[in-house]
Amino acid sequence: FTLPVENTLPEKLHETVYTVDYQDIRMITLNSNTSLEEQTPYLEKQLKESKAKWNILTCHHSVFSPAKGRDFEFARKNWKPLLDKYNVDLVLNGHDHTYARGHVPMTTTSSQGDDEITTVYVTSVSGPKQYEVDKDQMKAYEADGYTPDLTAEQTQFFHVITVENNTLTYVAYTAVGEEYDRAVIVKDFETGKKQLK
């Protein structure tokens, strides 16, 4: 099938870096395998110009990798500040052959609730190759503001994401259809504040 072509990007990124607007959702896809620096201005432009109520980013490599020895520092140092700045709702990743869902809380203020968040991050796996979760590495990401919520090993997943008005529901199912994980983001569109349920 044909994927969108962003003519402002080099040809080597065509059909691998693009944005799709669907109803109230802006889905931005980046190519985390090559030309990372060239994609950073594109990401900021897409987020800055977004009129969508929900912004979702997807790329292959994990911003917060749960697998031992796998770390995508470029994304944390260059893309995460943009995800924070523009209050991106959900980031979907793969690559690490393990499962992890976590979030970045909003910057602490005296009026902030404990469940207020900036972004939910998901790393998942659907194929047979599986790695172990590195709990020490997950703990180290706390310095970047990341809070791990749930991990899994030796399990294949698929996901269903639904959006209804001010609620985005993410559900992870095992390959045999059993629900493993659920995260519900409730968003106040006037303030931009989000709660994780």
PLM regions with names:
Residues 45, 51-53, 191-197:
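Short, solvent-exposed cationic patches
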Residues 1-51, 78, 100-152, 157-160, ...:
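Extended active-site neighborhood of metal-dependent phosphoesterases/phosphodiesterases
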Residues 60-62, 96, 166, 176:
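Flexible loop residues that form catalytic
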Residues 50-93, 111-114, 141, 146:
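Active-site-proximal segments of metal-dependent phosphoesterases and phosphodiesterases across multiple
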Residues 29-31, 56-60, 92-94, 100, ...:
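Short beta-strand segments
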Residues 64-67, 99-102, 131, 169, ...:
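Short catalytic/ligand-binding loop motif for oxyanion handling, primarily in non-cytosolic enzymes
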Residues 154, 162-164, 169-197:
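Acidic, histidine-bearing metal-coordination/catalytic regions of metal-dependent phosphoesterases
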